[in-house]
């Protein structure tokens, strides 16, 4: 109506029935999600859904994922071992059948960047995974493996998705890095480091305490 240039609409945590951890089920806020997606697609819009990989007990894949997850709970949910092909298959199949086939063609993959520098909200370095990885190794690979899983869900569908952590030399993934950086020093560090990934970065400048910053 106002000729605002926009072709990707992103839905944040409220689309889930439970967001921390995630249910991957549509909230009552969206009573007819498939019809909504069809209408938006017909108008030329792409729909991008926010999520993270920690699966709430109400998630349809929770039971199947129990034996393919790390040994800690995060926000009351399990976290899949995406280095395990079966975990990727379960996660990707659900996303494809429930969301992608309905018209979703992008995802915003959050909360996969925890480290010693970002607090203790995620799984610890001492975690163990069915694939044999430990928590330290999995923190480094989490974002890249998450992207790989979502690419399997999307099949050959074109996408421009977002991820909060990915490794170096990741230019083969159609994702954009983003970050929740609240400190100016962290922001500058991100500027310097982002090019190693080989993909675009969209920074969020949250705070400036001086004119110089």
Q: What are the residue ranges of the model-derived segments?
A:
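Aromatic- and carboxylate-enriched substrate-binding clefts and catalytic-loop regions
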Residues: 3-213
């Amino acid at each position: 109506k106002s000729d605002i240039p926009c072709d990707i609409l992103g839905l944040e945590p409220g689309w889930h029935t439970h967001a921390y951890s995630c249910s991957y089920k549509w909230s009552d806020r969206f009573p007819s999600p498939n019809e909504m997606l069809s209408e938006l697609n017909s108008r030329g819009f792409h729909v991008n859904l926010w999520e993270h990989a920690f699966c709430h007990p109400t998630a349809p894949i929770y039971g199947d994922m129990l034996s393919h997850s790390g040994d800690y709970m995060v926000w009351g949910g399990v976290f899949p071992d995406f280095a395990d092909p079966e975990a990727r298959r379960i996660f990707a199949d659900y996303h494809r059948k429930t969301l992608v086939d309905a018209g979703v063609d992008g995802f915003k993959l959050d909360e996969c960047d925890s480290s010693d520098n970002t607090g203790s909200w995620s799984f610890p370095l001492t975690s163990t995974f069915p694939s044999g990885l430990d928590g330290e190794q999995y923190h480094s690979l989490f974002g890249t493996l998450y992207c790989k899983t979502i690419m399997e869900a999307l099949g050959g569908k074109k996408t421009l998705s977002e991820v909060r952590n990915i490794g170096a030399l990741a230019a083969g993934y159609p994702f954009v890095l983003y970050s929740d950086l609240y400190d100016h020093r962290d922001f500058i560090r991100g500027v310097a480091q982002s090019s190693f990934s080989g993909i675009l970065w969209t920074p969020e400048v949250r705070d400036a305490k001086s004119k110089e910053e």
